[in-house]
Amino acid sequence: MIVVDYSDQSNLFDVDCLHYFKRSSVLKGEGRFRNYSREVRPISYCVKNDWLDYDIDYAEERDIDISVFFRKESERNKRGMTNRELVASFVDEYFKHKNIHVGIVDTDGEAGRMNVGREYVDKLLRSKIVVNCNPDDWEGDYRLFETLSCGSLVLVDKMITPAVNPFEHRKHLAYYDSLEELGSQIEYYLDNDNERKQTARNGYEYALKYHKTSDRIDEILEVIGI
C-alpha cells in the first residue's frame, strides 16, 4: 500500500505501507523537517484540474496592484496563521497608496480549497502581484498554485520542501525572507512592469508544464517503480 497524505496535521496515519508521501512534513518555525519514526517522502501541492481552464491574456492590463488573500492581525479567527496575518497587515499599512486587496474572498478553509470561487478567481485574474505566505507550522498551500494558474506574479516566503522541477527565484516567481525584503520585492516589480509580466508568464507556463495533478502522479509512480 502507498499513502499520499495531503493533510495539514503533522502526525502520520498508523498504517503499514511501502511508501509514505507527506505534504506537511516541515516544521516551518524551525526551518527543518520533522523527525518521524519511518521514512517519509515530501510531496507538494499542484495545479488542480479545475484551474487549468483559464485563458490568460497578457496584453490585458490588470487593475489590482497587490492582492493578499489572508486576514489581518485584527481579524484573527484561528491560531497558527500569525505569519500570514503579519504579511497581510504589512501590505495593508505600507501599500495603502496602491490599489490593493487584503482579506478573504469567497470561502476560506477546507471549503474554499475544494471549490473554485468566482470572486476569488476574478481577483486573481485582475492582480499584478499576489503575496502568499505559508502557515506558521508547515509548508504547502494551494494558493501558490492557484495564483500561478491565473498568471499573477507570485511573491512567497522561502521554502525548504524539495520539489521535482522547483520554481526558480526571479525566473518563475520571487521568494522573500522578511517583511523588509517583501516590501522591496513589491516596489521593484511594480516599478519594472515588463519584468513582472515576463516572470509571471514564466511561472504560469512552468506550473502548467511541470506541476499539474498528472505530474504529481508521475512522481509517485517513479518512486514506486511503475
Regions found by a protein language model. Name each.
Residues N194-I224:
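A charged, aromatic-enriched C-terminal amphipathic alpha-helix characteristic of glycosyltransferases
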Residues M1-E146, C150-H169, S214, D218:
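Nucleotide-sugar donor-binding catalytic core of glycosyltransferases
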Residues D122, E187-Y188, E205:
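Surface-exposed charged/polar residues within alpha-helices that form helix-capping/stabilizing sites
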Residues F90-E93, Y188, V223:
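A generic secondary-structure signal
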Residues E119, E181, Q185:
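Short acidic active-site motifs
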Residues L173-L179, Y189-D193:
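Conserved acidic donor-binding segment of nucleotide-sugar-dependent glycosyltransferases
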